[in-house]
Amino acid sequence: MLVDASVIVAILSREPGYVELEKRLAAADTPLIVTPLVKFEAVVSLARQKSTPQKPTPSLVRQAQQAVDAMVEDISASEVPISSEIGRLAIEASTNYGKSVGHIADLNFGDCFAYASAKALGVSLLYKGNDFAHTDLA
């Protein structure tokens, strides 16, 4: 199962619904997977949450990275690289479900790569929110 950045952020920020996401991770009967882009998106999002109205400081980014890395280790997730196939599928995801084409799923850059990674690896995608519910991964 590919773990989307939205799940990592929700759990580390203790957003509403985070306990259910923790339970789903614990109950997963397949290996958990992240990508460098998932980690990047989670780090940036967490650092932004902790910042003042100004942009996050390098220290906040490093703290967020440590938190994300620790969570990935705690859930024993494997990190897989972004391949050419994933890149191709991300473009396809953007074409079919992206913000750029006005699709209701409204997938952004990170979402398109999470979608593509799950597709390329043939695994399910654990996410928070409604965006992926409007794709064929739902």
Model-found features: residue ranges?
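Metal-dependent nucleic-acid phosphoesterase active-site entry motif
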Residues: 1-19
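A generic structural signal for short hydrophobic patches within well-formed alpha-helices
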Residues: 8-9, 39, 132-133
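Histidine- and aromatic-rich ligand-binding microenvironments
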Residues: 4, 34, 107-108, 129
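PIN-domain endoribonuclease scaffold, especially VapC-family toxins
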Residues: 22-33, 37-106, 112, 116, ...
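Short, locally clustered residues in the helix-turn-helix/winged-helix DNA-binding domain
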Residues: 13, 47, 119
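Gly/Pro- and small hydrophobic-enriched strand-loop and loop-to-helix capping segments
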Residues: 126-134
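Residues that recognize and position ribonucleotide moieties
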Residues: 1, 32, 125
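C-terminal structural segments of small proteins and small subunits
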Residues: 117-125
